[in-house]
């Protein structure tokens, strides 16, 4: 059973670095540090000293906004393109780590598409990991395990992952290089220049294009760059508010900008992403 095999070799104890083994409803290391699985199925591997607040990561409001918005299919063009990329670079019986997985929509979709790989999704938000585990359970996807941890302290064995994915999540090159196998694949998704242009134009007097990312982070070689774009029509204010709260602009916008969003009853906007595929040097 792929799932059990990989699980045993990949997650490590955040306290002592020893491999974790499943023990009933918990994970345990040789030094007897024990981590219980929550009822929904995720395991919390975030140590108290790695938290910067009592409830780090995205809060319930943000998690629910994303879950509701993505659940309506607005970003399906990206979800499908991402899953296709994972399939294209898949390794039979290999391990994929989704670092900063949020509520697991992309992780679960890829795990369904590539049943021959074992997926680990991790996020610093307990609310997000809980939503992700519930989603996997509801959809009967068993080749995935979610955990709570920071991308800056991944509780994952060095050189154990065939693939690492990072979608709109914090970047930690050192950790990503550490956990990937030699020549492992990194799949990164970022917003392209004109992503949500019409939403920005509705909110700001002088909207600006997104800054393109540097194309080759240290330690990686770019293999492929895939643009993914489409237009979406949001025909109600709830969806517009959910989309707005998923963006970094939500926290940087004046009260006037928030009022403009509240006044929109419909919005047609471009969505534009780049899928960047790298090989570890």
Predicted regions and their residues:
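Conserved Class I S-adenosyl-L-methionine
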Residues: 8, 228-281
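Conserved SAM-binding strand-loop segment of SAM-dependent methyltransferases
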Residues: 140-151
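Conserved SAM/SAH-binding beta-strand->alpha-helix loop
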Residues: 125-127
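Conserved class I S-adenosyl-L-methionine
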Residues: 93-102
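Conserved SAM-binding loop of SAM-dependent methyltransferases across substrates and taxa
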Residues: 103-115
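Class I SAM-dependent methyltransferase Rossmann-like catalytic core
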Residues: 58-77
């Amino acid at each position: 059973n792929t799932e059990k095999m990989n699980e045993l070799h990949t997650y490590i104890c955040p306290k002592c670095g020893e491999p974790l083994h499943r023990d009933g409803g918990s994970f345990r290391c040789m030094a007897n540090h024990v981590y219980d699985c929550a009822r929904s199925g995720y395991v919390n591997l975030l140590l108290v000293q790695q938290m910067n607040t009592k409830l780090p990561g995205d809060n319930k409001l943000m998690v629910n906004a994303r879950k509701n918005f993505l659940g309506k299919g607005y970003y399906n063009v990206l979800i499908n393109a991402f899953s296709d990329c994972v399939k294209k670079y898949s390794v039979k019986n290999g391990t994929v780590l989704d670092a900063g997985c949020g509520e697991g929509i992309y992780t679960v979709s890829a795990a369904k598409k590539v049943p021959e790989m074992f997926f680990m999704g991790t996020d610093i938000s307990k609310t997000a990991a809980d939503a992700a585990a519930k989603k996997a359970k509801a959809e009967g996807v068993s080749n995935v395990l979610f955990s709570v941890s920071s991308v800056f302290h991944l509780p994952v064995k060095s050189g154990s992952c065939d693939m690492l994915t990072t979608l709109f999540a914090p970047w930690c090159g050192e950790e990503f290089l550490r956990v990937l196998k030699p020549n492992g694949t990194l799949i990164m998704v970022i917003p392209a220049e004109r992503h949500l242009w019409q939403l920005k134009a509705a909110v700001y007097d002088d909207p600006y294009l997104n800054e393109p990312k540097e194309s080759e982070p240290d330690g990686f070689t770019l293999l492929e760059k895939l643009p993914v774009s489409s237009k979406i029509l949001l025909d109600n204010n709830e969806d517009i508010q959910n989309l707005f709260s998923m963006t970094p602009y939500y926290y940087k916008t004046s009260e006037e900008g928030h009022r403009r969003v509240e006044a929109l009853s419909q919005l047609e906007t471009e969505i534009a992403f780049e899928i960047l595929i790298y090989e570890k040097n």
